[in-house]
Regions:
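Bacterial N-terminal signal peptides
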Residues: 5-16
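N-terminal pre-domain segments of enzymes
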Residues: 21-71
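Buried hydrophobic positions in well-ordered alpha/beta secondary-structure cores of metabolic enzymes
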Residues: 45, 168, 230-232
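Feature captures the catalytic cores and cofactor-binding loops of soluble hydro-lyases/lyases
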Residues: 62-64, 76-228, 241-247
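Channel- or pocket-lining gating/hinge segments that regulate access to a cavity or pore
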Residues: 231-232, 237-240
Length: 247
């Protein structure tokens, strides 16, 4: 009986402590998360890496970027997924190089009680629409790359199709990096120069039994921990996340 009482008490403490967990991380938290950045920021708190730096980053080899960041203590900045999955990345337009600023999202398997909390907490934070796979897209700015961890889910894990892909292209003029899948591949491929994607694969199914856990928070993509606002360099079969590097 004593063990059961302690277990129930632990659950009560966990649930009561959930009020502190943000859904959309707020600007003051992101600023505290990225204190090394001394330059301009977006209103949401993310570092706004200059466009000039992002253009220069396109011409950098991964060895240069990884070497420089490694000297400054940042060693987990490179991922090609080949170490985890046989097929590595699938790239919609492999001939293109993509750089941009990370806007992050974490997806999880649907759990109704947690999703209820997410919806209620987001409303308290000022979000006026349901928190779905569209929630990160409406926050995109030009130059952003939408980076999401959807835990590698393929069937039923398709975060976007061509409609949302067009919305991303119009807003960010960049594209996506997903540890997961998408649908309507041919429609996404036809969007044009303002969209590209690094994904695990694609599937004709619609998104099912998934929930958005948080937006603009730290996420993991393979071997990389990505923070909101990180500068991203994505090339053929490869991806890297860079800090404030004077390249």
């Amino acid at each position: 009986m004593k063990r059961i009482s302690l277990f129930i008490l632990a659950l009560v403490l966990i649930v009561s402590g959930m009020n502190a967990q943000q859904v959309v991380w707020q600007p003051d938290v992101i600023i505290k998360l990225t204190p090394e950045w001394k330059g301009e920021r977006y209103p949401d708190g993310r570092p706004k890496v200059p466009d000039e730096l992002l253009e220069r980053l396109k011409n950098c080899a991964f060895e240069e970027v990884q070497g420089y960041l490694g000297m400054h203590g940042y060693r987990n900045v490179f991922e090609n997924f080949a170490s985890l999955y046989e097929n590595g990345w699938h790239i919609i337009h492999p001939e293109r190089v993509m750089t941009g600023r990370a806007l992050t999202a974490q997806f999880m398997p649907m759990r109704p009680d947690f999703n209820d909390y997410v919806q209620a907490q987001a409303k308290e934070e000022g979000t006026h629409t349901p928190v779905t796979n569209y929630a990160p897209i409406i926050k995109l700015q030009e130059g952003d790359i939408y980076v999401a961890d959807s835990y590698g889910k393929m069937e039923g894990g398709t975060l976007i199709g061509s409609n949302l892909g067009n919305a991303i292209a119009n807003a960010s003029k960049r594209g996506v990096i997903y540890n997961g899948s998408l649908r309507d591949y041919e429609g996404l491929e036809a969007i044009g120069e303002n969209f590209n994607g690094w994904i695990r694969g694609y599937d004709p199914s619609g998104i099912q039994q998934m929930m958005t856990a948080w937006v603009n928070a730290p996420i993991r993509i393979g071997r990389i921990t990505i923070l909101p606002g990180d500068a991203i360099l994505a090339k053929k079969n490869l991806g890297t996340s860079a800090k404030d590097a004077p390249l």
